[in-house]
Amino acid sequence: MLDDAVATQDTVTQLIGAVRRVARQVPGAAAVIAAECRGHDYTQPGKPRIDWTDPQAKQELVSALVTDANAVVAALTGAGSDQVELDETAAAAVALLALVAGQDVEPAEGSDGRDGRWRIARRVAPDRVISTVDEQARHTRKSQHNRKDGYRAHLVNEPGTGLITDEALTMAAGPDNSDAAIAARFVANTVPNPNNQDRDEQDRDEQDRDEQDRDEQDRDEQDRDEQAPSGDGPIAADPAAPGTDDAGTDDADCVLTAVTDDHEGAVAAGAVAGGNGQGEGLTWYGDSAYGTGDLRAAIKQAGHDAVIKPKPAQPAVPGGFTLDEFSVDEDSGTVTCPAGRTRQLSPNRTVTFGVLCRDCPLRTRCTTSKTGRSLDLHEHDALLRAARADWAADPALGEDYRHHRPNVERTVAQVATQGGRRIKLRHRGTVKNNAWLKRRTAALNLRNLIGRGLARLDGTWVLAT
């Protein structure tokens, strides 16, 4: 986790800031705000002057600000609006106002919201915008009690050398930014570069025009070029995939590592030569944040091995049966419970034992539900079961995992801290911060390679042997 460059804002600050942004960026919005808004004078700096120790005064203020925000959005976008078509900047400002007007509030007690009575919601929105200054900064949790604001940095690390072979910076929350989701993209070498997202369509158009002008020889040369390594991704000896999860554990969870049998020599050669082949026979290491069925399937499909600490199966009843004590026959599509009773697996991979649980002597160890035990099996349930079984049966897997973990933690500390203090990002948004992360990891790699004897000999970069 990397701290963002802006202050986290409360709901009142966000509402006022979003209205002011609309006034600045939307043509004619200042007049609309003056005509529609009654809760606050948005031309005045600072927060409203109320008794902030009075809960009733605060709730009335929240109601007034939300009502103002909804009125402005309706006036600018509703049917019969006299406003001109909004450009991209103006539309983004109005969309942000609509978002902050709804993400933190709920109708007051006894209200459905139509009477203009609102209150701060007793929950946190899953993908809450925490600042109108940096709209991509997010809340996340490293544990139940350790909450952070900012961004997630994901690293591909080779633990034997400490080299970082790929990296990505994402928002801290959201399923697409989880540890395992980013790791799967790294495995496939398809992590999108935020710096290129705005140019994707233009690049595709230019590519189409170029292809139409090429003759057969040019296309053959292009095909040969495309088969060569590009130098922008995990190298053959050490692709490792980072990931992020909304409820991660510690800093080391941001790195997934991969090694080969002769990883040190191969990594050094690949790094100096600039190769980025994915390579065969890699072993990927990660903690339980990476233990999803989808990631395990991606690693297997890519022809690699996974040494990823699995999350233990949890019983529905304390001390009772876990999922692993139910037998699943994928061929026949059936599930058998610990009491030996069998049910058919539904097309969406759920099963309910229902009436079979009524007179079951093992019921108290299985479920407290009146409708009996039910299961929801993952698409890759077989891989998850095998991982848990292998981890429990083979102590060497845990030893191998623990052997590499300290080196990974050291790499994370080098990226996330400087002078013993955690780094605070200096930019807003994923694009600029991702560029910063790439420069930082490149500098750390260069320092690492120089320490290993990197030198220039006869015009070529070489490593001392």
Locations of the language-model features?
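Anion-binding and metal-coordination hotspots
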Residues: M1-T465
